[in-house]
Amino acid sequence: MGRHSTKTSSAFTKLAASTIAFGAAATIMAPSASAAPDSDWDRLAQCESGGNWAINTGNGYHGGLQFSASTWAAYGGQEFATYAYQATREQQIAVAERTLAGQGWGAWPACSASLGLNSAPTQRDLSATTSTPEPAAAAPAVAEYNAPAANIAVGSTDLNTIKSTYGAVTGTLAQYGITVPAEVESYYNAFVG
């Protein structure tokens, strides 16, 4: 094209260029819908049930996310337990992900709105028949450590603190389906007598 020739553009070319530019800008500026992280479910449970995943309020809603029996059954909850409060936190979250995929965050209207929840559902694969994880192919070597003996008198407040702390830790682990290794139990029992 010559230097002094007039440039012409068709209306179609202008429209196409505008559409592509607008689409690119919208894609870049749109918030991404990431998967619902566990922290969202924990926040929702805190709002719905005070964070108690095993709650049975007696009002027809159960578990940390306050499932009705019909919603629990409709989204496959009975694969894990009859009612949500009888299922683990992870199982309740798996059913919640299915509920989220089917109903959106409107299944928990007040709390999801007040918390600003908007993430997309995530498929979680939990099997009701698999209650314990598969053993690892090869366990790493255990380093031996002989700790110096502590001088704590039986009945002292230090020993009571150890007992209460150990009880709290094992109780929390049990809520998540984690058992304390036998070696740790035997060390603890040998220590506290």
Curated annotation (Swiss-Prot):
GO molecular function: hydrolase activity
Presence of keyword ATP-binding: no
Residues of the signal peptide: 1-35
Pfam family, one: Rpf1_C
GO cellular component terms, semicolon-separated: extracellular region
Source species, domain of life: Bacteria
Compartment list: Secreted
Classification via Gene3D superfamilies: 1.10.530.10, conserved protein domain from corynebacterium diphtheriae
Keyword annotations of the record: Hydrolase, Secreted, Signal
Effects seen without this gene: Not essential; a double rpf1-rpf2 disruption mutant is also viable. The double mutant displays a prolonged lag phase and slower growth after transfer of long-stored cells into fresh medium.
Family the UniProt entry places it in: Belongs to the transglycosylase family. Rpf subfamily.
Function: Factor that stimulates resuscitation of dormant cells. Has peptidoglycan (PG) hydrolytic activity. Active in the pM concentration range. Has little to no effect on actively-growing cells. PG fragments could either directly activate the resuscitation pathway of dormant bacteria or serve as a substrate for endogenous Rpf, resulting in low molecular weight products with resuscitation activity.
Protein's UniProt name: Resuscitation-promoting factor Rpf1
Source organism per UniProt: Corynebacterium glutamicum (strain ATCC 13032 / DSM 20300 / JCM 1318 / BCRC 11384 / CCUG 27702 / LMG 3730 / NBRC 12168 / NCIMB 10025 / NRRL B-2784 / 534)
